[in-house]
Amino acid sequence: MLFESLGASIVTASVDTADEMKLVAEGKCFPKREKAMRFTVCHGVTHEISKTVGAFWYDHAEGKDKNYIAGESKDYMQPAEFVIDCILKKVILCSYSDGGLGRIDSGDLVGWLSGIQNRRDEFPHVWSW
């Protein structure tokens, strides 16, 4: 996998249950990839975890007039993405969102990681836009 060759690991997390996230990991629900994800998929994110990482929390009881997810009736953490340098033990890049925009693009991340490792010749970056 490309990220592994850059010394990076991908970990995802959701408020969903283990059974729901198993379907996501297997590519059997949104987004309908129809192929398994090759990275760690976690479940059970709580409001406390959201506060710990500084992410926005959608409280359904407070925001029921805003349909971020049509028909959805549960609380959830908004997208929060981090690149953590495990040697320095520091977050070196992060992105917080309150919807579908403003996320870290995987192609851009490959370019960024290869740049800080002085390996751009090995991993030529093509801007997605």
Question: Where are the regions that the model predicts?
Answer:
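Chalcogenol-based redox active-site neighborhoods
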Residues: M1-W129
